[in-house]
A protein has these predicted regions:
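Polysaccharide-binding surfaces and accessory modules of carbohydrate-active proteins
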Residues: 1-202
Length: 202
């Protein structure tokens, strides 16, 4: 199992890719080509954003930067949402990473629940407006995951009456794939869940 993926990051001249001010003239450093934990719009990362806020002046750039972290000796819970909870057999741990957006004062907290015995990591996110003006939240995902390129496949489930959850399998390519239901709820037509696996995994 890989523990440190930094050796897989290929740094080369990324001409015409956006560079943050801190990179100076280093054209090998671009938010558009490096793995991101929180991709956001307006800062040189052109992938789909995880968080999109609109400020009172109409701007939607959001530059979330690491601020602090905390390790809790219990699992986290999100009110009204399903979750894994501490039991007598296993007590989870939680890593909370706090990121701040300097211009707006918005704080993004990332929660990582770890259940080591079950080999499970859960993720949630919470946005807090600590600024002096209102913001409009246009988009908020609980997580975004950049994976280094390998031969992955996506398994998802479509169906119809009396033939629910028919497994479909497609290779991951340079394309956008959306999994979801347009009925307003999950159903026998579509189950909004995905399995990401290595090519040919059974």
């Amino acid at each position: 199992m890989r523990k440190n993926l930094s050796g897989l990051i290929f740094c080369t001249d990324m001409g015409f890719a956006g560079n943050p001010e801190e990179a100076g003239s280093d054209r090998t450093y671009s938010l558009d080509t490096l793995p991101q934990e929180v991709p956001s719009s307006g800062v040189g990362d052109y992938r789909d954003d995880m968080v999109r806020i609109r400020q009172v002046d109409g701007s939607c750039a959001a530059d979330f930067r690491f601020d602090s972290y905390e390790i809790l000796d219990h699992s986290y819970a999100v009110p009204g949402m399903p979750a894994l909870y501490d039991t007598e057999e296993e007590k989870g741990e939680t890593l909370v990473i706090t990121m701040k957006e300097k211009a707006s004062g918005v704080v993004l907290k990332l929660f990582y629940g770890v259940f080591e015995n079950e080999n499970v990591i859960t993720r949630a996110a919470r946005l807090e407006n600590h600024g002096e003006t209102a913001i409009e939240l246009e988009k908020m995902l609980s997580f975004s995951m950049d994976l280094m390129y390998e031969n992955y496949e996506v398994i998802y489930f479509s169906g119809r009456h009396a033939m629910e959850r028919t497994a479909e399998r497609i290779p991951v390519q340079h394309a956008k794939v959306e999994i979801g239901s347009t009925r307003g709820t999950s159903s026998h037509h579509y189950n909004p869940a995905v399995i990401l696996c290595e090519e040919g995994a059974g």
